[in-house]
């Protein structure tokens, strides 16, 4: 606890965070500018009674966690990642009273102590949109701008919080209480465009996969890259691209029994990944007239796609409609059209 409360000077150099993010995250110059602007605004309007809280909101696989790590590196601070998803009560923040069995300090204090961290750390609460009502209530108290400390029930003392930099990463902003959103700076992390994805695969993903699997001279043809991004890696981020590349490399190394001069082709993608995962715009003419099926438009940031919704009759089920998948809002209209 003595080390945790030790004060460490925080240095902020204007533009350093933006430069680091641009160098680390290909195709996210806009994100770098937004994050740097938010940190600069907090720095210029510095209030010793208020800690800095940023919210990185965007689709899965768009580099929110990596951005938090880069921010800590650029600011010269330590970094601690905590998974907020699944937290059921306030002990995550406040700890447990000593009179209760298996009592202990809050997870935040335990992890800071384990890493010999200080209260000047960058704390990343990941999956912040998957918390419970009680955990959100405790976090709302942590964000109180009028207090400089938060109280730990087990340690029975107040922990200074004003120098902490809190970064929340989440996918669905609608699940977060409005009272919390009012106390944080939101930075939207948009998905990658098709051209950005191509550049990321060529400049980053191929090198990353080659290093991981110790492959010399790894490449992919332009037609194969076009096919992969159009019909298989359909999510806004690049996480599914990396998973597909991993499958392709494992199969190629296994079949060719070598780790040199590997080239991913269209035939390899078709053979390993199988049928395409979603309908694209080119399929619209031949697929729209199929009974029980309708096309739906999906959008995330500046990325759009065309997907199919299918209705299947179950003779063993009573008169009821069940849906599966992430169908929300206007997407349900396409379901009724298909029926």
Predicted regions and their residues:
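Pre-Walker A (pre-P-loop) alpha-helix and adjacent loop at the N terminus of AAA/AAA+ ATPase modules
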Residues: 2-3, 9-54, 339
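Walker A/P-loop
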Residues: 47-84, 113, 140
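Conserved P-loop NTPase/AAA+ ATPase motor core
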Residues: 247-339
């Amino acid at each position: 606890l003595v080390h945790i409360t030790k004060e460490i000077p925080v240095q902020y150099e204007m533009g350093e965070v933006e430069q680091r993010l641009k160098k680390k995250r290909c195709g996210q110059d806009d994100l770098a500018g937004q994050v740097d602007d938010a940190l600069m605004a907090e720095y210029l309007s510095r209030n010793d009674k208020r800690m800095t809280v940023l919210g990185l909101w965007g689709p899965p696989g768009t580099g929110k966690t990596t951005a938090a790590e880069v921010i800590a590196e650029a600011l010269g601070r330590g970094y601690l990642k905590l998974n907020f998803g699944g937290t059921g009560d306030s002990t995550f923040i406040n700890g447990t009273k000593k009179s209760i069995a298996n009592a202990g300090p809050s997870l935040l204090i335990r992890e800071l102590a384990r890493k010999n961290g200080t209260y000047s750390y960058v704390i990343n609460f990941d999956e912040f949109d998957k918390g419970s009502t009680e955990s959100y209530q405790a976090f709302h108290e942590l964000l109180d701008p009028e207090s400089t400390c938060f109280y730990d029930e087990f340690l029975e003392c107040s922990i200074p919080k004003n120098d902490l930099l809190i970064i929340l990463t989440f996918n669905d902003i609608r699940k977060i209480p409005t009272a919390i959103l009012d106390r944080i700076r939101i930075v939207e992390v948009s998905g990658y465009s098709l051209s950005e994805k191509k550049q990321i695969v060529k400049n980053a993903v191929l090198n990353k996969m080659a290093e991981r699997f110790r492959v010399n001279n790894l490449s992919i043809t332009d037609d194969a890259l076009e096919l992969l991004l159009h019909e298989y890696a359909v999510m806004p981020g690049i996480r599914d691209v990396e998973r597909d590349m991993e499958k392709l490399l494992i199969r190629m190394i296994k079949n060719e029994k070598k780790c040199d001069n590997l080239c991913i082709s269209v035939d390899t993608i078709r053979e390993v990944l199988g049928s395409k995962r979603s309908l694209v715009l080119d399929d619209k003419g031949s697929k729209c007239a199929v009974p029980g099926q309708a096309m739906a438009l999906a959008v995330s940031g500046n990325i759009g796609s065309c997907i199919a919704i299918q209705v299947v009759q179950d003779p063993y089920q009573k008169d009821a409609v069940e849906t599966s998948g992430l169908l929300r809002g206007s997407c349900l209209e396409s379901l009724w059209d298909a029926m």
